[in-house]
């Protein structure tokens, strides 16, 4: 039996950051079920390559969290300027598609520009987040950009009906150009610096797991291989597999919100119904190690139906230390609505697709492969989510518990935001 002031479920970036802020000020236990810290912000080694769970890049916006993250990395960091592209109609064009149409065929370019200008002149603004995505993108970007990129790409990514997907998530992640930028990006020079991720940081060595390892250093309460099976917030006790009870005064959850409610013994029926309505997709990441295959881009988006994956990147362009000398490493992302992916067929399609777009010369270059599965990858924004979260969060507040991070708060966010929420959650406990 253990007793602690604070139980933190999950040793990802949110949980590790909360622990760092609590260190020496309150007793805490971070229960991380895996044998390494970081959750999805971890790195796996195989055959001399280091593979992440897809592209995990540090886009820093806030001074306090930026300093916290950069101090943790110390000199083990690189600052890079984004080189992201879109491959559509057998051509490359810079990302974001809507502001960089110059690479597209003339007919596609004209459709996209004229459609955008019509939509812009019709007015209406970005909306309040409740509008269905399929209607919103046509209203905001016009028929051309929607048909050639927004609709096919997002259908591949979310694996959820776009007529039911709401748009609350769009503001930080979908850049909105002006008419001048759209025209200039189609017929003039490339539009630079648009979007939230134009510059990013990445560890020089160790993959993104280097950040998690740095945050875990000196964490007296981190317990790896500790899986929480059930929680009773009213009684302040958690049952841990192969260990027994852990008693706590306050709790911070960073595990998927629906899973947390399901294992909470004291969750009322209304809260359970709300959690059961939450939806997410599943992402399978194929990591490839290859001889040679030097290309200068960081990652690319693939809206076309000829590519079953939605995005692919060259991780060794984030840091050369991710691959042996003379080699490159790739990641290719496939999404499903939760069903299993045929890995053998998907791998063949990935290699064929990378060769078709020129990222890879030939299949024989591939020397290493590793599949990584993200069971809960992107949480779905729909009307059910909007109705469920107030119910669940109201119960958590009454129990003086916090659920934070990308999955604990059930939202689409980036790594710095998880760190920020961890620090803020700890701050609230220290002030209580």
Pin down the residues of each PLM region.
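A conserved FAD-binding loop/helix module that cradles the flavin
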Residues: 406-430
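Dinucleotide-binding Rossmann-like beta1-alpha1 core, especially the glycine-rich loop
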Residues: 47-125
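C-terminal segments that line or cap access tunnels to active or ligand-binding sites in enzymes
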Residues: 248-250, 258-402, 413, 420
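Short hydrophobic core segments
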Residues: 7-9, 31, 246-260
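Glycine-rich FAD pyrophosphate-binding loop
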Residues: 23-46
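N-terminal Rossmann-like FAD-binding beta1-loop-alpha1 element of flavoenzymes
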Residues: 4-30
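Conserved Rossmann-like nucleotide-cofactor binding loop
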Residues: 14, 36, 258
């Amino acid at each position: 039996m253990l007793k602690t002031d604070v139980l933190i479920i999950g040793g990802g970036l949110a949980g590790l950051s909360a622990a760092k802020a609590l260190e020496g000020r309150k007793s805490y236990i971070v229960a991380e079920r895996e044998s390494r810290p970081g959750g999805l912000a971890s790195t796996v080694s195989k055959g001399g390559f280091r593979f992440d769970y897809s592209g995990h890049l540090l886009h820093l916006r806030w001074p306090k969290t930026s300093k916290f993250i950069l101090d943790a990395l110390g000199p083990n960091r690189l600052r890079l300027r984004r080189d992201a592209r879109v491959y559509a109609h057998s051509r490359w064009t810079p990302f974001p598609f809507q502001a960089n149409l110059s690479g597209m065929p003339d007919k596609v370019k004209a459709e996209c520009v004229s459609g955008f200008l019509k939509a812009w002149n019709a007015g209406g603004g970005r909306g309040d987040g409740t509008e269905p995505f399929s209607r919103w993108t046509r209203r905001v970007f016009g028929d051309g950009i929607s048909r050639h990129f927004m609709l096919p790409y997002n259908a591949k990514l979310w694996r959820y009906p776009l007529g039911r997907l709401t748009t609350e998530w769009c503001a930080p992640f979908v850049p909105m150009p002006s008419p001048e930028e759209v025209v200039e990006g189609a017929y003039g020079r490339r539009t630079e610096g648009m979007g939230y991720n134009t510059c990013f940081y990445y560890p020089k060595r160790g993959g993104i797991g280097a950040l998690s390892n740095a945050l875990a250093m000196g964490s007296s309460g981190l317990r790896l291989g500790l899986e929480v099976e059930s929680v009773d917030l009213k009684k302040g006790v958690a049952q841990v597999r192969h260990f027994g009870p852990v008693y706590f005064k306050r709790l911070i959850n960073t595990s998927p919100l629906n899973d947390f409610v399901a294992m909470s013994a004291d969750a009322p029926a209304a809260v359970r119904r709300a959690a059961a309505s939450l939806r997410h997709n599943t992402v399978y990441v194929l990591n490839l190690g290859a001889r040679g295959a030097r290309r200068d881009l960081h990652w690319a988006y693939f809206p076309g139906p000829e590519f079953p994956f939605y995005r692919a990147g060259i991780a060794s362009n984030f840091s050369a230390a991710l691959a042996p000398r003379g080699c490159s490493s790739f990641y290719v992302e496939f999404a499903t609505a939760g069903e299993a992916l045929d890995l053998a067929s998907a791998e063949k399609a990935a290699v064929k697709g990378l060769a078709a777009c020129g990222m890879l010369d030939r299949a024989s270059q591939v020397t290493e492969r590793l599949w990584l599965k993200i069971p809960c990858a992107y949480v779905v924004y729909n009307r059910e989510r909007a109705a469920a979260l107030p119910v669940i969060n109201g119960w958590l507040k009454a129990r003086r518990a916090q659920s934070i991070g990308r999955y604990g708060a059930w939202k689409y966010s980036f790594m710095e935001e998880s760190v920020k929420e961890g620090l803020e959650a700890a701050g609230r406990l220290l002030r209580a």
